Curated annotation (Swiss-Prot):
Function noted in UniProt: Specifically catalyzes the NAD or NADP-dependent dehydrogenation of L-aspartate to iminoaspartate.
Pfam families: Asp_DH_C (PF01958), NAD_binding_3 (PF03447)
Major enzyme class: oxidoreductase
Protein name in UniProt: L-aspartate dehydrogenase 2
Listed GO biological process terms: NAD biosynthetic process
Record-annotated active site: H219
Amino acid sequence: MTHRIAFIGLGAIASDVAAGLLADAAQPCQLAALTRNAADLPPALAGRVALLDGLPGLLAWRPDLVVEAAGQQAIAEHAEGCLRAGLDMIICSAGALADDALRARLIAAAEAGGARIRVPAGAIAGLDYLQAVAGRDDAEVVYESRKPVAAWRAELPGMGIDPDTLAESRTLFSGPAREAALRFPKNLNVAATLALAGIGMTRTRVEVVVDPRARGNQHRIQVRSPLGEMQIELVNAPSPANPKTSWLVAQSVLATIRRHLARFTIG
């Protein structure tokens, strides 16, 4: 069976995912993308990914699955229409879901259209554990994001920090996951994913650190409850095309697509 998969956005993540799907002969796919600029299409995908004209064009193409990888604004613009039309979605820009009102509208749209929303793990691990403790009032979750200067180069000057002279680690934020995800939409989607899987946007605590000595994009997750403790530390290689995101993210999205299409899944 050939699956029809449409992307919203065709940046570093979506391009890597599209290439992975096209290389998988065991799971043939037809691909299309809704993107603001046709020049976004990498040469390797030219002629293999159809370019769509706005949300009407996407709906007319009738995909089996829509993969959003264009940023939080794209969710506000396109997700509700896709879901009401009955199109299952994978949402990569999970930070948008920190907005309770938007999340409620998307869930209502999915219910109206008979569609499903999936959020990939992305750069992190341990979501199954967080889901297991989600209902406990006595659970504590702390997440630390520690990234090198390259991941924050565009934002640091606005915080009064010179990225070229920063020699020591600096804490950029400490607070609840909701605020982290909405304040840093290009860097903290992970915070929203953790909170949605676990104990919520308010109780999930987030520390954001820029560290010139960081070996890569580092993620530390600590969970404590009477059920036990979990500590995870990941050191992900940054994406060659976008240092704000981990190279692993595209593979996580690809795995989520394969689970969505599969008859047999684990986890």
